[in-house]
Amino acid sequence: MVENEVDLPNGGAGAIEYLDMLAKLGVGNAHPGGFGETLEQLRKYPIEKGSRVLEVGCGTGRTACYMAEQGIQVTAIDIRPEMIAKAKVRAEKTNVQVEFVVGDACQMPFEENTFDVIMVESVTNFAIAEKAMSEYYRVLKPGGKLFDREVIRIKEMTSDIHKALCSFYGVAQLFSMKEWQEMLESCKFSRVEFSGAHPFPRTMFEDQVQHPDPVHLSDKQSFLDPEIWKVSAQYDQLVNKYHRYLGYTLMMAVKE
């Protein structure tokens, strides 16, 4: 049966509204799998102390500050100044040193061959993906590694469903694992690997319970803003309706 019911509840939400919601609430684990997946990745693929790491799309800085606590030299970039401001507050509260930079993943203010590792958590989808991947390659040192956790399309969908999902999230396209691999290879990455094709989580509640964020960075009165809860409700309803089309994976690749 082909599913064509794609109207978003209460009239729909756009990219700015969804990303604004995350910014205003100061969400530190919005990526698929949450902070638990971040911890698991760092256990499974440890980064050596002293490595120079770039986190792209750092948000409120939870991952960046955690890595800094482990003795890693971290630079973190985000396109939204309000996110960088909150990330700096987190770094101060957790007493760690992170270089935070406001900037675009598609045009990063770093020299070639600068970083040993690039960490990305559900950011490339929101950028011009191939352009961002080319930038990751440019600023990595030879032998440097890319770790990028992104949403993937795991089941073919109608164009209307694809359009509705892309419109809500503010992305141009939802890529399959094969399409991500082709993109990485076209950007000159080698040794491309994927860790799983996990079901898309229908809620962040479990991760928030298991890994509560000790630093609260929500805007004042944000929890009383009806527009935020409108977008939150739209997110829940959209994910509940179409989650079977989506998954997520950790992509790993090397600049040789």
Regions found by a protein language model. Give the residues of each.
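Short, glycine-/aromatic-enriched active-site segment of Class I SAM-dependent methyltransferases
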Residues: 25, 151-171
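Conserved class I S-adenosyl-L-methionine
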Residues: 2-48, 62
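A short glycine-rich, Lys/Arg-flanked "PGG" loop and its adjoining helix->strand segment in the class I
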Residues: 130-145
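Conserved Class I S-adenosyl-L-methionine
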Residues: 195-256
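A short acidic, Gly/Pro-enriched loop at the edge of an enzyme's catalytic core
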Residues: 106-117
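Class I SAM-dependent methyltransferase SAM/SAH-binding core
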Residues: 54-56, 60-107
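Short alpha-helix
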Residues: 172-188
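A short SAM/SAH-binding and catalytic strip from SAM-dependent methyltransferases
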Residues: 117-129
